[in-house]
C-alpha cells in the first residue's frame, strides 16, 4: 500500500465511522469495516512515522453532533481490540504478558451505555459517544424496564453495559416499521442504538430493550478481581447472562469460544464475539492502555453473519397459492460457513421500500436456518450501470395474466405447473406428511417425467415408475415406497395442514381436527368463525376451499389412514382450556410439548399477555419469561409441568 492509498483509506474509514456513529446509517458491513481497519493497522505498524492523526485507529469515535445534550463520562469509555483467530488471541495474550486467569463473557451486539448512580439513585444515562463525551439519554434509559432506578449502594458509581434488542422483538419492530412505511433497521444493534436516541420516550419503552452490564467506570469498590466486581454489580439488580466464566488458560478460553459459537443461534440476542480480559485488577492497572484500547482485554470476534455482495438479478418463484415471490440472485458470498447465492425479496413492495436495483451493492444477513435476506442497499456506491427491477404482468411459468393485489402478484391458473409442483412439495414436507426421501428435486423429477400429476398420484407410485430414472436403485426405490406407505398413517391435523389452505396453519388445523374430527370440511361459515382464534378471513378461506375440494377430501380419506384427534382429546382439569406459552430450551422439541399440551384440551400461544395462564420455560428463556413474571403469570419448569399433567394441584 502506498502512502497516498493509505490516506484514501483513512478518509473512507472516517466516512464509514461517521455514518455508523452519528447517523445510525452504516455505509458498509461490519466485515468490510473490520477489514479496512486491519489494513490501516498493518500499514501503521510498518510506518509509524506516517500515521495520520485522522486515522480511526487513533480515535474512538467522531465528535458527537445531535439534538441531545452532552455528558462527560467521569472515566473514559474505551473500545476493545479485536482478535479474529487463535493466532491473534495468543499474540494479544503475549502482549498482555498474561496466559492465565481470564474472565470471559458474550460480546452482545448492541449499543454501549454508561449509567451513573449517586446515593443509590440513577442520575444519568449516556451513550459511549467518543469515549469521553456521550449523549444524555437519561429519560429514555429510565424506560428500560430491567435497569434499576434505585440500587442498594450509596457511593458514586458508573455502571457500563450493552443495550440489546432480542431477536424476536427485533422482527416485530421491523414488521411494524414496514407497515408504517418506515425504513427497516439493518440489524438489532442499529435498532438498539436508534431506540435509545428517540426524542419520544414512549417509542423507547415499547421497544422492550434489555441492558446487560459488562463493567464499571468511576467507582470506589475494593475488589481485587473483575469477576468479583461483576458479581457485585449483578447483586444490585442487574441481569446476568448464563455464559460467564473464569478460566485458567488460553486453551480453556478457546474451548469456551467454540462452545459459545455453537450456541450463537440459540441465544435470544445477537452476539458478535466473546470478551476476554485479565481478571486480576492490579495486573490490569499495570498493563494500562494504548491510545485507543485497554491492553488487558480483547474482543474475540465471531465469523460475520452479515456481508456485502452484489445483486446480479431477480428470479420470480411461483408458490403453491400462486403468489409470485421475487428472489435476489447474488454474487456468491460465504456466511457462517454457508455459501449464499440468493436471498428473499418478499414482494414488490419490499423492492420499492429498499429501493434496490440490479447491480447494487447490498448487505445480506443470515442467522441459523433463517432464509438470507437483504437488509440494506449501499446507494452511495452506484456507478450508473444499475437497472430497475420491473414488475411482471405474466406468470413466469405458464404465461397467464397475473392478478395485481398491490404488494402481491398472483397466478390464478390452477393448472400452472409451478403451483402443482409446490403444492406437492409442501404436502410431503416435514411439518406435513413428512415423507422421508421425497424431497424437492425428486418431486420435480417425477412431475417432469409424468409419474405424478397431483398430490394423490404420489400414493399410487409403483416400483416400475422409478426403474429408468437416474439415481434410483433397488434399495432407494424400496425405501421411498415404504416411506410413502408409512405416511398414509398420520394425524388428521397434519393432513389438514398439508392441504395448504390459505390462512390455515398448524394451530388452526389442530383446532379444526379437535373440534370437528373427520367432519371438519362439512361445517358452515358460522361454525368456523365461532372457533376460538378464527376470524372472518380464515372462515371464508375454509368455506371456499371445502366447497371446491369436497369430493377430493373424501378421496383422500379413502387413500389415507387418518387418526381422529377429536376422540383422543383427554381433558385435564389442571390445564384444560388454559393458555400456555413455551420459551427457552427444553428436553424435547417445542413441537412435542405443544402437541402434548393441546392433547389435554389447552392451547399454546406465541406471545405472553395477561390472559396467559402458564409459561413453560427451559434454559436460556428470554423476554417472554421476564414479561410473564412482571405480569404475575405462573411460570413452570418441566418438572412442574409433569406434575400438572399428573393432576398435582399443589403446583
Curated annotation (Swiss-Prot):
Residues 570-651 form the BRCT domain. PROSITE patterns: BRCT, DNA_LIGASE_N1, DNA_LIGASE_N2. Zn(2+) binds at residues 395, 398, 411, 416. Its EC number is 6.5.1.2. The active site is at 107 (n6-amp-lysine intermediate). This is DNA ligase. GO terms for molecular function: DNA binding; DNA ligase (NAD+) activity; metal ion binding. GO terms for biological process: DNA repair; DNA replication. InterPro entries: BRCT_dom (IPR001357), BRCT_dom_sf (IPR036420), DisA/LigA_HHH (IPR041663), DNA_ligase (IPR001679), DNA_ligase_AS (IPR018239), DNA_ligase_CS (IPR033136), DNAligase_adenylation (IPR013839), DNAligase_N (IPR013840). It catalyses: NAD(+) + (deoxyribonucleotide)n-3'-hydroxyl + 5'-phospho-(deoxyribonucleotide)m = (deoxyribonucleotide)n+m + AMP + beta-nicotinamide D-nucleotide. Keywords: DNA damage, DNA repair, DNA replication, Ligase, Magnesium, Manganese, Metal-binding, NAD, Zinc. Belongs to the NAD-dependent DNA ligase family. LigA subfamily. It holds the Pfam family DNA_ligase_aden. It comes from the Bacteria. HAMAP family: DNA_ligase_A. GO terms for cellular component: cytosol. DNA ligase that catalyzes the formation of phosphodiester linkages between 5'-phosphoryl and 3'-hydroxyl groups in double-stranded DNA using NAD as a coenzyme and as the energy source for the reaction. It is essential for DNA replication and repair of damaged DNA. Its cofactor is Mg(2+); Mn(2+). NAD(+) binds at residues 30-34, 79-80, 105, 128, 162, 301. The keyword Nucleotide-binding does not apply.
Amino acid at each position: 500500500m502506498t502512502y497516498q492509498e493509505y490516506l484514501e483509506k483513512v478518509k473512507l474509514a472516517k466516512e464509514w465511522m461517521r455514518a455508523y456513529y452519528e447517523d445510525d446509517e452504516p455505509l458498509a458491513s461490519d466485515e468490510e469495516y473490520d477489514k479496512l481497519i486491519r489494513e490501516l493497522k498493518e500499514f501503521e505498524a510498518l510506518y509509524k512515522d506516517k500515521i495520520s492523526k485522522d486515522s480511526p485507529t487513533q480515535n474512538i469515535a467522531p465528535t458527537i453532533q445531535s439534538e441531545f445534550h452532552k455528558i462527560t463520562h467521569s472515566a473514559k469509555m474505551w473500545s476493545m481490540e479485536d482478535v479474529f483467530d487463535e493466532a491473534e488471541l495468543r499474540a494479544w495474550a503475549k502482549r498482555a504478558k498474561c496466559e492465565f486467569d481470564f474472565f470471559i463473557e458474550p460480546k452482545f451486539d448492541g449499543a454501549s451505555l454508561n449509567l451513573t448512580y449517586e446515593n443509590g439513585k440513577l442520575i444519568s444515562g449516556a451513550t459511549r459517544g467518543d469515549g469521553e463525551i456521550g449523549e444524555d439519554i437519561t429519560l429514555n434509559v429510565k424506560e428500560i424496564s430491567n435497569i434499576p432506578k434505585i440500587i442498594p449502594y450509596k457511593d458514586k458509581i458508573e455502571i457500563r453495559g450493552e443495550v440489546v434488542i432480542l431477536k424476536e422483538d427485533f422482527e416485530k419492530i421491523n414488521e411494524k416499521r414496514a407497515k408504517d412505511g418506515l425504513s427497516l433497521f439493518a440489524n438489532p444493534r442499529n435498532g438498539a442504538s436508534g431506540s435509545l436516541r428517540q426524542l419520544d420516550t414512549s417509542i423507547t419503552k415499547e421497544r422492550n430493550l434489555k441492558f446487560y452490564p459488562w463493567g464499571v467506570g468511576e467507582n470506589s469498590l475494593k475488589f481485587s478481581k473483575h469477576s468479583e466486581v461483576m458479581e457485585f454489580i449483578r447483586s444490585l439488580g442487574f441481569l446476568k447472562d448464563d455464559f460467564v466464566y473464569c478460566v485458567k488458560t488460553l486453551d480453556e478460553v478457546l474451548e469456551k469460544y467454540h462452545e459459545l459459537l455453537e450456541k450463537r443461534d440459540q441465544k435470544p440476542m445477537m452476539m458478535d464475539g466473546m470478551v476476554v480480559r485479565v481478571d486480576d485488577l492490579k495486573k490490569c492497572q499495570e498493563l494500562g492502555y494504548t491510545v485507543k484500547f485497554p491492553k488487558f482485554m480483547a474482543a474475540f470476534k465471531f465469523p460475520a453473519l452479515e456481508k456485502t455482495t452484489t445483486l446480479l438479478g431477480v428470479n420470480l418463484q411461483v408458490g403453491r397459492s400462486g403468489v409470485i415471490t421475487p428472489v435476489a440472485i447474488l454474487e456468491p458470498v460465504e456466511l457462517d460457513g454457508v455459501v449464499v447465492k440468493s436471498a428473499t425479496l418478499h414482494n414488490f413492495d419490499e423492492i420499492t421500500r429498499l429501493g434496490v436495483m440490479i447491480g447494487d451493492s447490498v448487505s445480506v444477513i443470515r442467522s441459523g436456518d433463517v432464509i438470507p435476506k437483504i437488509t440494506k442497499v449501499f446507494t452511495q456506491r452506484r456507478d450508473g450501470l444499475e437497472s430497475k427491477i420491473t414488475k411482471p404482468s405474466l406468470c413466469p411459468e405458464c404465461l397467464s395474466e397475473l392478478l395485481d393485489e398491490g404488494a402481491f402478484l398472483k397466478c390464478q391458473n390452477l393448472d400452472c405447473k409451478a403451483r402443482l409442483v409446490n403444492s406437492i412439495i409442501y404436502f410431503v414436507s416435514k411439518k406435513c406428511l413428512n415423507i422421508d426421501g421425497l424431497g424437492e428435486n425428486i418431486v420435480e423429477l417425477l412431475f417432469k417425467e409424468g409419474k405424478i400429476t397431483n398430490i394423490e398420484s404420489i400414493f399410487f407410485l409403483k416400483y416400475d415408475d422409478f426403474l429408468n430414472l437416474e439415481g434410483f436403485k433397488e434399495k432407494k426405490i424400496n425405501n421411498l415406497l415404504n416411506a410413502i406407505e408409512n405416511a398414509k398413517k398420520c394425524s388428521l391435523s397434519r393432513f389438514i395442514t398439508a392441504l395448504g389452505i390459505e390462512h390455515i396453519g398448524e394451530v388452526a388445523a389442530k383446532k379444526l381436527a379437535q373440534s370437528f374430527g373427520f367432519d371438519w370440511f362439512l361445517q358452515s361459515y358460522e361454525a368456523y368463525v365461532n372457533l376460538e382464534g378464527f376470524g372472518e378471513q380464515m372462515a371464508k378461506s375454509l368455506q371456499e376451499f371445502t366447497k371446491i375440494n369436497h369430493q377430493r377430501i373424501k378421496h383422500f380419506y379413502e387413500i389415507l389412514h387418518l387418526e381422529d384427534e377429536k376422540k383422543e382429546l383427554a381433558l385435564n382439569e389442571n390445564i384444560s382450556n388454559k393458555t400456555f406459552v413455551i420459551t427457552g430450551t427444553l428436553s424435547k422439541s417445542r413441537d412435542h410439548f405443544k402437541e402434548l399440551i393441546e392433547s389435554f384440551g389447552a392451547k399454546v400461544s406465541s406471545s405472553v399477555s395477561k390472559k396467559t395462564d402458564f409459561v413453560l420455560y427451559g434454559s436460556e428463556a428470554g423476554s417472554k419469561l421476564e414479561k410473564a413474571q412482571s405480569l404475575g403469570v405462573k411460570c413452570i419448569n418441566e418438572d412442574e409441568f409433569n406434575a400438572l399433567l399428573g393432576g398435582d394441584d399443589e403446583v
